């Protein structure tokens, strides 16, 4: 099972390392392929006044320290094409945000690196249309078609994070997992799927109480891994606190997901 977890944004090295330390029990499990996640910049915050992060240079420096201290593989976001070569020096996975999932130049630049490319499905996207984004990356790396096998070979992943459902709300169509998994490995982002974009007066809201339910459903349907942002105290988080999982609640949830995944895969023979 792939697991990407960590705080939404880098707040400080102390906060970053505290979460990294709390996640060690998960990272040490043989059945979990763990990636530590944190963003150096939240470039699409609702308000200009909202905290964005330390920026590219300082953020990568802090993530590099986490990598050295804990031995973690790193995943972080990219926002502009020029950042790819810099991020690739630190990150093992470069993530293309949902709002940028169709940006050809960005996808191509990330695909030119030797890092895994994780493309988040836009909240506005038909899941079947994500094969075009996948194919941009695959062809950049010398492949020819968007199939699960070629996506896996060339290191191209997709992440489901919910679809727009009216104003300020998202819903998860579990069929999306099946559709996208026909042409790429799929990660389920359980924390952003419970986000309520822009619904909290100048910032996004959310309801993390729904995270376990959606995650268990995704495990039963079948995915390649999970993305879950976490914080020691989500109420004090500087970004996405309402939809993050408290770190001490994450470990038992992940074990439960692993059990469900094993059960359903055995029954389905996959």
Swiss-Prot record:
UniProt keywords, alphabetically: Cytoplasm, Lipopolysaccharide biosynthesis, Transferase
Reactions catalysed according to its record: D-arabinose 5-phosphate + phosphoenolpyruvate + H2O = 3-deoxy-alpha-D-manno-2-octulosonate-8-phosphate + phosphate
Chief subcellular location: cytoplasm
Subcellular location: Cytoplasm
GO MF entry, a single one: 3-deoxy-8-phosphooctulonate synthase activity
UniProt enzyme class: transferase
Gene Ontology biological process: keto-3-deoxy-D-manno-octulosonic acid biosynthetic process
Family: Belongs to the KdsA family.
Protein name (Swiss-Prot/TrEMBL): 2-dehydro-3-deoxyphosphooctonate aldolase
Source taxonomy: Bacteria, Pseudomonadati, Campylobacterota, Epsilonproteobacteria, Campylobacterales
Gene from which the chain derives: kdsA
């Amino acid at each position: 099972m792939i697991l990407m977890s960590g705080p939404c944004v880098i707040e400080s090295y102390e906060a970053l390392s505290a979460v990294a330390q709390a996640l060690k029990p998960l990272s040490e499990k043989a059945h979990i392929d763990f990636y530590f996640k944190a963003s150096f910049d939240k470039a699409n915050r609702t308000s200009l006044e909202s905290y964005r992060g330390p920026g590219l240079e300082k953020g990568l420096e802090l993530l590099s320290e986490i990598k050295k201290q804990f031995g973690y593989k790193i995943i972080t976001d990219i926002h502009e094409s020029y950042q790819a070569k810099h991020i690739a020096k630190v990150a093992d996975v470069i993530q293309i945000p949902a709002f940028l999932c169709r940006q050809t130049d960005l996808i191509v630049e990330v695909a030119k690196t030797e890092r895994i490319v994780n493309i988040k499905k836009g909240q506005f996207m038909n899941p079947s249309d994500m094969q075009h984004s996948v194919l941009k990356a695959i062809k950049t790396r010398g492949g020819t078609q968007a199939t699960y096998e070629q996506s896996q070979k060339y290191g191209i992943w997709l992440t489901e994070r919910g679809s727009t459902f009216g104003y300020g709300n998202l819903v998860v169509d579990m069929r999306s997992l099946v559709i996208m998994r026909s042409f790429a490995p799929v990660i389920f982002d359980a924390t952003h799927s419970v986000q309520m974009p822009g619904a909290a007066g100048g910032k996004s809201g959310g309801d993390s109480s729904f995270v376990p339910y959606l995650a268990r459903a995704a495990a039963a349907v079948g995915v390649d891994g999970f993305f879950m942002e976490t914080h020691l105290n989500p109420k004090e988080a500087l970004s996405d606190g309402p939809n993050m999982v408290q770190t001490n609640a994450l470990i038992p949830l992940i074990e439960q997901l692993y059990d469900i995944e094993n059960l359903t895969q055995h029954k389905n023979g996959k």
